[in-house]
Amino acid sequence: MSYSAGEARGQILDDVAEATDQLALALASLGEAYEELDVQTADALEEQLFRPVQSAYGRLRRTHAGFAERHGFPVREFAPSSGGLHSADPRVYVDRAVDAIERADHALAELQDSMLPVEVGDRELRAGLSETRSTIAELPARARRLMRVQGR
């Protein structure tokens, strides 16, 4: 199947936006979990999960905006997300965050595997995708460890 460079770049932007939206959901969910935790666990959640997700989210937003600008596409504004239905159990929110982080990582992995970033992307795009994936790679395991301790 053939495609134009413009169509392929549009697909890249759509895929990056999907992953960015998932990280926004993870941030919102972690924020909700923070409110339901004791101070010590909340501080650990902030340090081990929230800050890295926030960093990855910011990096991916900048990657999206920069790629769009460099190739003449409109820059998208990303809206904050909701943590979902309220729960008094912080593990529910952390599970939602983990699911969202894993969906973001999967979307970025599929994009990288498609070779579009190599064929029609640029160095800055590839660096942003790689840095984001490196930042979020260990977060699901960290979240599970943190919640295992919380459940005791």
Locate predicted features.
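Preference for long, well-ordered alpha-helical segments
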Residues: 100-103, 107-152
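Short, charge/polar-rich alpha-helical segments
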Residues: 90-95
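A taxonomically broad motif for mature regions of secreted/extracellular
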Residues: 68-71, 75, 143, 147
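Short, charged/polar, low-complexity loop and linker segments
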Residues: 3-7, 76-89, 113-125
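Extended alpha-helical coiled-coil "stalk/arm" regions that scaffold and mediate dimerization/assembly
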Residues: 31-39, 71, 79, 151
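Conserved alpha-helical segments that form or flank metal/cofactor-binding pockets of metalloenzymes
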Residues: 51-73
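Leu/Val/Ala/Ile-rich N-terminal alpha-helices, chiefly Sec-type signal peptides and the beginnings
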Residues: 1-57
